């Protein structure tokens, strides 16, 4: 396993693409990636550079990153128009459709907590 250890050191060691450092989180030392994005919103925004690349394939449907961002922006605007904003929670009870991801990104990129729920639950289970 010497090669594996060497690869890990090259990737996570000083100057590596995934360099790991120790940071302070509320007084607790935590290992973290030096170049990690600050939040999930930044992760989603970083994908704008792939505008014309395929983001999602579902059956015969294909969605580029640009199209996904347009839809996410539209969903976020709709949520805001409904009075849903930062700090609120939105339940997502849906099968594994592309729209699940789009709603998720719309929520977390605007400070809304996305709460994934099992789409097979009964109404009583969801209400609980």
Q: Can you describe what each PLM-predicted range is?
A:
Residues 35, 52-108, 122-127:
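Conserved AMP-binding/adenylate-forming core of the ANL superfamily
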């Amino acid at each position: 396993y010497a090669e594996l250890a060497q690869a890990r050191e090259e990737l996570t060691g000083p100057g590596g693409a995934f360099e790991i450092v120790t940071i302070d989180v509320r007084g607790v030392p935590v290992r973290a990636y030096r170049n990690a994005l600050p939040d999930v919103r930044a992760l989603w925004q970083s994908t704008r550079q792939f505008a014309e690349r395929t983001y999602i394939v579902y059956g015969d449907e294909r969605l580029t990153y640009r199209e996904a961002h347009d839809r996410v922006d539209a969903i976020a605007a709709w949520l805001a128009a409904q009075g849903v904003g930062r700090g609120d929670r939105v339940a997502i009870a849906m099968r594994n459709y592309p729209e699940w991801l789009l709603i998720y990104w719309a929520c977390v990129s605007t400070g809304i907590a996305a709460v994934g729920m099992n789409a097979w639950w009964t109404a009583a289970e969801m209400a609980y």
